[in-house]
Amino acid sequence: MTQCTQSNFEFQAHFSRDVVARFDGGTISSEGGSLLLRQTDQRLNLLTRFGGCFLDGREQDRIEHSILEMVSQRVYGLALGYEDLNDHEQLRKDPLFGVLAGREELDKPLAGKSTLNRLELGNGQRDRYKKITFWKPGVDELLVNVFLEAHPQPPEQIILDIDTTDLPLHGKQEGRFFHGYYDSYCYLPLYIFCGEHVLCARLRSSNSDAAAGSLAEIARIVGQIRTAWPAVKIILRGDSGFCRNELMNWCEGQGVDYVLGLARNQRLRKIIGRQMWEATEQWNRTGQPSRVFAEFRYQTRKAKNRGWERERRVAAKAEHIDGKENPRFVVTSLSKEQWPAQELYEALYCARGDMENRIKEQFSLFADRVSAETMRANQLRLYFSVMAYVLVSGLRRLGLKATELAQAQVSTIRTKLLNDHRLKVGGFGGD
């Protein structure tokens, strides 16, 4: 049987130039897979809108490097595995990066590390050298808009996952505090996802409650979603770090359902004493992990005005595993008719574990590179990593369906596709 292998691939033209990728094109530029990201960006219109979230105080007739070019440099660089500004001292000379950044004159280099550094350090104040700043509300709104645009029709129901993680610090950055749980100096960013879509990435100091600021972010996101999809049903899902009376009260008042982890205590353990005994007996008979589920109404005791004002439904898992008790609890606004206790815990609550994979992908895109002096600059670095994630996940969603990379992590996509040095790109010399 005759087998035909396509020898070249045509991409969106770059001004008057054709862009063609071949597997025998020499060594002019070896990041040929990055053109797939360029195609994805043109579908999403991501980087143009992201660049529009910056305020440029420079004299426009004396500008050598536009904001869009510099923003594109940083985002594409992170997506392709170039985490350091020093990397751009070489990348700026690569004609393919010129194509990615949208530069028309490919014989001229892109911005160097010092110029890119000034892009990060702008604080909105009058400064001779740092005249660019970014508008956080605009970036936040863009993330939600990308999520909304990914759906041709409004879904009936969505689940918002909320979580936090630690970004270790090794210098004297602004907002640096020691966190006992993580046993290190760190930032404590707040992430909110819906499936693979990142809706919020808020940098925070680690000297506050894990849920600090979460209500404001949820209210903002829910408001924007309901403006576009007024009939959508929304469920908020998070661990016990977000089980706060203020947040649950707001959800109940706004018609947002929730399922949140509930930290165990002696009162809760006593309530499920019979189920815990049954689970232990099953383990004694079989030697296998055993689970017994229960549900009940529960209200915390008020302490320093932090208790619950009302009873709420709690689902419990009485588990005995490896010779030890392992009780777990979740509090929810969902009824038992909608979600019986076992299904609520196993099928709905435990599915939040997938968000941990999405957070790991942020680290694959260098979200932990927060070594700038100010929190504002480090928030921008976090945004750069998030935009790189949106770009690669967009490629995964739009371009890799029904392929072996359809469910791959972004690091795998980078290694197997974006950084495949067998794909060379040439032909940058003429019109």
Task: For the regions a language model picked out, list residue spans one by one.
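Short amphipathic alpha-helical "interface-anchor" segments enriched in bulky aromatics
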Residues: 40, 88, 344-375, 380, ...
